Amino acid sequence: ADFILASSKLADEGYNPNNKLMFVEPGIYKFQDILLNGIEVPHDRFGGRRFGMATVWSWEQNNLKIVHMGGAAGEIDINSQIILSRPDILFISVGGGIKSYNGNEASQIVKILKPSIVIPVHFVRGKNIIDSCDFSNADLFLKNMKDFKVKYLGKKFKINSKRIDKNTIYIFKD
């Protein structure tokens, strides 16, 4: 990776072991030919009063608008909705916990932003729930996303910007 996009620098996040170029603060940044837009959103369900604010990232790459909301847990204001709306690809946390959207919250954000492709993150894969982890699996999110088809993938996949699967959720199995 050439750089790291992080949502926050909390003690359990934003780890940068190789001291790579890392973007974490809200703002507009340019890396080579990619313009990164970091938008501040609550990192909790209390308007940021518990865990502060997180950074949600949006950028264009290969003619695709990409939004990454892995570190968001709170509501997004109307200005952020306008900036983030209609991405080709939306990465969004769905597993719940104290610092990320649960399946109900994530499905509401998807309905507001209207992405073509959704890639869920921050959830427990499979049916096994780990006692020491406050994430759940993606079942609740998928239950709320009846208008989307679901495709299960291996470790990687390619997207053709000229032929995007509309209303599709991609879930990585590994």
Give a label for each model feature.
Residues 9-28, 109-113, 130-149:
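Ligand-binding grooves and catalytic loops that recognize ribose/phosphate and carbohydrate rings
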